[in-house]
Amino acid sequence: MDTIVWTVALMAAVGLVGSVLLLIVSRKLAIGEDERLTYLMSILPGVNCGACGHPGCEQYAKAMMNGAPPNACTTGGDRVAQALAAYLGVESTGVVQREAFVACQGSLDHIDPQLVFKGVPSCRVFSTLSYSSLSCPFGCLGYGDCAEACPFDAVVVENGVARIDTAACTGCGTCAKICPRGIISMVDQASSPTASVVTCKNTMAGAKTRKVCSVGCIGCQKCAKTCPTQSITVENNLARIDTDTCIGCGTCIEVCPTHAISKLVFQ
């Protein structure tokens, strides 16, 4: 009987000691994880723009602790990527430069307003109510939701159209996500420091486009026929440029009769 009691007591003591040791180790590991997270957070910009594909900087830091690559922060650029890689002890391949551009040039100089909207000055509200203040149903509404949302003040509205300050743009994509008409796009830099982009989203036939906007794409295919790298196709009356293969030569810009193609310079 005594043997059984002592055996049970010994097992209980071993279990207690083991539990205490596990608690101590887990707390030390937790402290270590907290320290890593804090340090990674100190390197990141802390603007929570979501360009990395995560809701915020903390979530990205946690993802890196679980193996995510350190080069997803376009806001921080190569400097932040290298610092993160050095701390994590991994190799950084550098950050792919990304720029936003507005696929619309329909300012008040090129398009006629159809009505005056007297309400909340918001693109989202205006779009939800299905109003069309412009003769072009694809154009920028110009109420500046994108400018208000940009954490870097890289978007301004000039003469009724949003414009991106490429020097201030970090490629976070906040403006593109909030635009109700989807006319703001993100372009990743390929081999060339410049790329040609179509600054129009109008898919109406060329004759109809000419009636509503003087700088809209009319689908004439001149750009596609002259592109030396065959980077341009015309689908549904709208030219589309593959920026991965575009070398930024500008040939398409020169031949476009409505000046609906512009050069995008990566900063």
Over which residues does each language-model region extend?
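Cys/His-clustered metal-coordination modules, chiefly Zn-binding fingers
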Residues: 229-238
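Ferredoxin-type iron-sulfur electron-transfer modules and their immediate structural context
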Residues: 2-226, 230, 255, 259-262, ...
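Basic, amphipathic alpha-helical segments enriched in Lys/Arg and hydrophobic/aromatic residues
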Residues: 250
